[in-house]
């Protein structure tokens, strides 16, 4: 009951694929009978079934993988001393199957198409588990990678730091501070030296004694270079820095033209998901050219509320500056900008802000 099955005996015939074209995957999604419900991956993408053309292939069936275009395992949250259930399957009876943990064989069997293991994870850090199947001289593998955490270091916040990005003298280091009470582990992932968007032991944040704050000092930064990063909370939740002054948006940055914002840092596609924060030591300072500005009397204000994107087609500050004389001729002596900090989506009046300090 409540289980449905559909069999495709020959994908090439079923989908009318020409003989010279290689079939790599079948894209699928499921809908309820009335079409109201949809089952897909957590990122909303269709699910993909790999099509194996070789005589032998293998993959992990436990732990479960999300069938994204490049399959990713369901979140694995393990600590030193935990066990992990592993099951590898093959599409044919293999002459030999093996399971490796960090390069060491932990299970081995002949003439099987299923192999299981339940190793104890004894060392912290990145773990690599490989399933291997061999038949008539051909060997195929599947690889599973995840992070095993040790107990976080408990240490008070360094003197003088506050929530967010704290730039230190010398322009080669920062202290990141995140308020995340009740969490078990927080790590920093990004394009910092040695990180490459993978959870690493030396990027696990310290926890304050009151369990409210997490902090990490990152050194070896190049002055003036932009670095992108996220916080990885409990090994599953990726969040940007709430106090960041600049972010990368995977869904909307592509619509920003070079004339509006030249040289925008590329989003790390394929390495992470969600909004990404930016930090930059020794960032160029803004040079104020008007130092004697006097505000109009607040009792005599004539305010024009302006949405930058709608007011001028170029939706940039330079064009607005060239248009100020028009507003002055109308008698306007003050402009109230509609929210121009980061907000959800790319076309909005800005009343659904996402990052209050990122213009």
Where are these regions (language model features)?
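Exposed beta-strand face motif in extracellular beta-rich ectodomains
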Residues: 22-28, 125-129, 225-227
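Basic K/R-rich, polyanion-interacting modules in nucleoproteins and related proteins
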Residues: 145-186, 240-300
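Solvent-exposed segments in extracellular or luminal domains encompassing
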Residues: 111-126
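Short, compositionally biased P/S/T/A/G/V-rich stretches that sit at domain boundaries
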Residues: 52-79
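Aromatic- and acidic-residue-enriched carbohydrate-binding clefts of CAZyme catalytic domains
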Residues: 302, 343-359
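An acidic-aromatic substrate-binding cleft motif
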Residues: 278-334
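Aromatic-rich carbohydrate-binding modules that target alpha-glucans
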Residues: 1-20, 33-43, 170, 175-226, ...
């Amino acid at each position: 009951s409540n289980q449905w099955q559909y069999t495709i005996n020959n994908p090439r015939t079923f989908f009318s694929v020409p003989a010279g074209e290689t079939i790599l995957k079948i894209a699928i999604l499921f809908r309820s009978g009335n079409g109201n419900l949809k089952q897909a991956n957590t990122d909303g993408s269709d699910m993909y079934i790999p099509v194996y053309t070789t005589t032998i292939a293998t993959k992990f069936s436990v732990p479960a993988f999300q069938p994204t275009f490049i399959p990713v395992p369901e979140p694995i949250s393990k600590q030193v001393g935990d066990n992990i259930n592993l099951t590898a399957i093959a599409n044919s009876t293999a002459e030999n199957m093996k399971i490796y943990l960090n390069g060491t064989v932990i299970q081995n069997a002949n003439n099987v198409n299923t192999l299981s293991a339940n190793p104890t994870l004894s060392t912290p850090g990145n773990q690599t588990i490989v399933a291997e199947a061999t038949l008539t001289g051909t060997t195929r593998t599947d690889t599973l990678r995840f992070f095993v955490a040790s107990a976080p270091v408990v240490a008070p916040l360094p003197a003088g730091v506050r929530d967010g990005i704290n730039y230190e003298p010398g322009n080669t280091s920062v202290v990141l501070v995140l308020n995340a009470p009740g969490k078990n582990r927080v790590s920093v992932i990004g394009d910092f030296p040695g990180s490459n968007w993978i959870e690493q032991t030396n990027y696990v944040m310290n926890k304050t004694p009151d369990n409210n704050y997490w902090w990490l000092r990152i050194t070896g930064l190049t002055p003036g270079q932009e670095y992108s990063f996220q916080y990885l909370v409990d090994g599953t939740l990726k969040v940007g820095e709430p106090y960041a002054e600049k972010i990368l948006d995977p869904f909307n940055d592509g619509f920003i033209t070079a004339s509006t914002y030249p040289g925008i840092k590329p989003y790390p596609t394929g390495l992470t998901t969600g909004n990404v924060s930016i930090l930059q030591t020794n960032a160029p300072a803004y040079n104020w050219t008007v130092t004697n500005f006097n505000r109009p009397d607040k009792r005599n204000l004539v305010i024009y509320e302006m949405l930058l994107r709608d007011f001028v087609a170029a939706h940039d500050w330079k064009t607005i500056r060239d248009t100020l004389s028009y507003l002055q001729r109308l008698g306007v002596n003050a402009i109230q900008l509609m929210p121009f900090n980061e907000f959800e989506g790319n076309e909005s009046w800005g009343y659904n802000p996402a990052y209050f300090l990122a213009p």
